[in-house]
Amino acid sequence: MPTNNQLVRCGRKSKIRASKSPALNGNPFAKGVCVLVKTITPRKPNSALRKMARVRFRNGTCVNAYIPGEGHNLQEHSTVLVRGGRVPDLPGVRYHIVRGVYDTQGVKNRKQGRSRYGAKRPK
C-alpha cells in the first residue's frame, strides 16, 4: 500500500481498457468494401445460417461484419458502413454493417424498429 507522500507525488494510474472493436481506431463508423459475403452457423445451442461479410477498410484492415435483418443485396465489391457491436453466438464477428447506407439497402416491409434497419416509414 502506498504512503500519502507517494500518492501525492505519483497519484493512482487508471487501468487502460482494451477496445472491443479495435479496427475502428476509436471512430464510431468506418467505410469499407466487401471482399466476401457468406453464411455461417452459430455456436452451440443455436442453429441458423447467419449472413456475414468480410470487409476491407481503407487502411487495409479486414474484419468480419454481421449483416442484420431479413434479406440483403450485398455482394463482392459493395461499399458498406461498419459499426462496432458483436454478435453473441458468432465467434470472431465483432462488427455490424449499417443498413440503408451506401450500397446496403434497408430491410423491406419493416414496421417496427425501422431506424436500426434503414427502413422508410410506410405510408
Swiss-Prot record:
<dbReference type="GO" id="GO:0000049">
    <property type="term" value="F:tRNA binding"/>
</dbReference>
<comment type="function">
    <text>Interacts with and stabilizes bases of the 16S rRNA that are involved in tRNA selection in the A site and with the mRNA backbone. Located at the interface of the 30S and 50S subunits, it traverses the body of the 30S subunit contacting proteins on the other side and probably holding the rRNA structure together. The combined cluster of proteins S8, S12 and S17 appears to hold together the shoulder and platform of the 30S subunit.</text>
</comment>
<dbReference type="GO" id="GO:0003735">
    <property type="term" value="F:structural constituent of ribosome"/>
</dbReference>
<keyword id="KW-0488">Methylation</keyword>
<feature type="modified residue" description="3-methylthioaspartic acid">
    <location>
        <position position="89"/>
    </location>
</feature>
<comment type="subunit">
    <text>Part of the 30S ribosomal subunit. Contacts proteins S8 and S17. May interact with IF1 in the 30S initiation complex.</text>
</comment>
<dbReference type="InterPro" id="IPR005679">
    <property type="entry name" value="Ribosomal_uS12_bac"/>
</dbReference>
<dbReference type="InterPro" id="IPR006032">
    <property type="entry name" value="Ribosomal_uS12"/>
</dbReference>
<keyword id="KW-0820">tRNA-binding</keyword>
<dbReference type="GO" id="GO:0006412">
    <property type="term" value="P:translation"/>
</dbReference>
<keyword id="KW-0687">Ribonucleoprotein</keyword>
<comment type="function">
    <text>With S4 and S5 plays an important role in translational accuracy.</text>
</comment>
<keyword id="KW-0689">Ribosomal protein</keyword>
<comment type="similarity">
    <text>Belongs to the universal ribosomal protein uS12 family.</text>
</comment>
<dbReference type="GO" id="GO:0015935">
    <property type="term" value="C:small ribosomal subunit"/>
</dbReference>
<keyword id="KW-0694">RNA-binding</keyword>
<dbReference type="Pfam" id="PF00164">
    <property type="entry name" value="Ribosom_S12_S23"/>
</dbReference>
<dbReference type="InterPro" id="IPR012340">
    <property type="entry name" value="NA-bd_OB-fold"/>
</dbReference>
<protein>
    <recommendedName>
        <fullName>Small ribosomal subunit protein uS12</fullName>
    </recommendedName>
</protein>
<keyword id="KW-0699">rRNA-binding</keyword>
<dbReference type="GO" id="GO:0019843">
    <property type="term" value="F:rRNA binding"/>
</dbReference>
